[in-house]
């Protein structure tokens, strides 16, 4: 039986031009082109950081994993929102005769909002898939963060006052309402690293970053809001974007530009440990998580009738959403129902999955 590993990431613009960024942004918005001012802002951010190394770094990570596991698995790489796209790579895998595939998403934590979005592309009548849901507890990855933060504390902070700010990509607040494990995983991940460092609860905190302006509330506190709200600052802030593993715009701009600029304004020293990128400890974590999971059940992913963002649910789904107060239905869903009428509301795919997980909706 021919087996493969499919390493997947979010993607990035294929070229840093206005239209290159527009194409990428349009893919993120599921084919709806953002307004020009939104594209211009994102384009300017890419220009500010000199482009993005994400694709280069990810391909290097793939090569390093292949060097360790290539005798047993064919290793492929795909992006969610840029070339090579996941469906195209799956097509190539089918042509290569692959029958089983371990899906290794290069995001350590599981979220309904993000990771589930990869699963909808896993359509093949030939290939059975095994999706590794999360791998943030891998000891090698925890050691990486602890070691790199410890270097900053020893070499740069020394005896000065400091605070470690663990940040993670925010998610819409309805993810919390419906029991998304992501938030708890981020807190646990931060605590595990802090314990390795011997940090007290006063020496570190959790914040969120990189939320999108799509008209719905996101998990707080935002890292920039957190900084502005502090009445007193330590001598040093150490920013640890723990939900990411590679340098890309949400680290190089959101942290290294926006957080840095605020630190300059407040007279605080800014620090950020290097991202794992191609470090051997990250590769150890990726290889080990494959080993730990490779004997689990593979299954066929059939195409969903609904997509991640466009779902016309059954009347039962709509009724449950409208009538179950204990689900803490997000305000934007209530407003949609009030404005359009229950029969006309399109619910996000992930809300249906959250309802199933909460036992409020039987799996079909």
UniProtKB/Swiss-Prot annotation:
Gene3D superfamilies: 3.40.50.1400. It holds the Pfam family Ferrochelatase. Its EC number is 4.99.1.9. It catalyses: Fe-coproporphyrin III + 2 H(+) = coproporphyrin III + Fe(2+). Keywords: Cytoplasm, Heme biosynthesis, Iron, Lyase, Metal-binding, Porphyrin biosynthesis. It is found in: Cytoplasm. Pathway: Porphyrin-containing compound metabolism; protoheme biosynthesis. Fe(2+) binds at residues 169, 250. Its main location: cytoplasm. InterPro entries: Ferrochelatase (IPR001015), Ferrochelatase_AS (IPR019772), Ferrochelatase_C (IPR033644). One of its GO terms (biological process) is heme biosynthetic process. Fe-coproporphyrin III binds at residues 29, 118. Disulfide bonds: none annotated. GO terms for cellular component: cytoplasm. HAMAP family: Ferrochelatase (MF_00323). PANTHER family: FERROCHELATASE (PTHR11108), FERROCHELATASE, MITOCHONDRIAL (PTHR11108:SF1). Belongs to the ferrochelatase family. This is Coproporphyrin III ferrochelatase. It comes from Streptococcus pneumoniae serotype 2 (strain D39 / NCTC 7466). The gene is cpfC.
């Amino acid at each position: 039986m021919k087996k493969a590993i499919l390493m997947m990431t979010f993607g990035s613009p294929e070229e840093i031009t206005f239209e290159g960024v527009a194409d990428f942004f349009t893919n993120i918005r599921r084919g709806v082109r953002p307004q020009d001012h939104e594209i211009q802002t994102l384009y300017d951010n890419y220009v500010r950081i000199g482009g993005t190394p994400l694709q280069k770094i990810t391909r290097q990570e793939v090569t390093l994993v292949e060097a360790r596991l290539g005798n047993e698995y064919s290793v492929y790489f795909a992006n969610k929102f840029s070339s090579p796209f996941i469906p195209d790579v799956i097509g190539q895998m089918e042509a290569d005769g692959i029958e089983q595939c371990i899906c290794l998403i290069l995001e350590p934590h599981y979220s309904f909002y993000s990771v589930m979005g990869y699963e909808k592309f896993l359509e093949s009548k030939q290939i059975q898939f095994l999706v590794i849901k999360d791998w943030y507890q891998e000891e090698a990855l925890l050691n990486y963060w602890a070691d790199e933060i410890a270097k900053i504390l020893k070499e740069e902070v020394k005896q000065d006052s400091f605070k470690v700010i663990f940040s993670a990509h925010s998610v819409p607040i309805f993810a919390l309402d419906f029991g998304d494990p992501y938030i708890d995983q981020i807190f646990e991940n931060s605590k595990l690293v802090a314990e390795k460092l011997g940090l007290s609860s006063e020496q570190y905190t959790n914040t969120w970053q990189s939320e999108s302006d799509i008209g719905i509330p996101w998990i707080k506190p935002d890292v920039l809001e957190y900084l502005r709200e502090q009445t007193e600052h330590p001598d040093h802030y150490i920013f640890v974007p723990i939900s990411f593993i590679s340098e890309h715009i949400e680290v190089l701009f959101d942290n290294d530009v926006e957080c840095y600029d605020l630190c300059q304004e407040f007279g605080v020293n800014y620090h950020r440990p290097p991202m794992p990128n191609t470090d051997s400890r990250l590769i150890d974590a990726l290889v080990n998580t494959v080993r730990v999971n490779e004997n689990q059940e593979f299954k066929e992913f059939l195409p969903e009738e609904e997509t991640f963002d466009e779902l016309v649910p059954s009347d039962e789904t709509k009724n449950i959403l409208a009538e179950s107060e204990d689900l803490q239905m997000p305000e934007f869903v209530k407003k949609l129902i009030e404005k359009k009428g229950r029969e006309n509301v399109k619910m996000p795919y992930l809300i249906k999955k959250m309802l199933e997980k909460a036992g409020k909706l039987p799996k079909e």
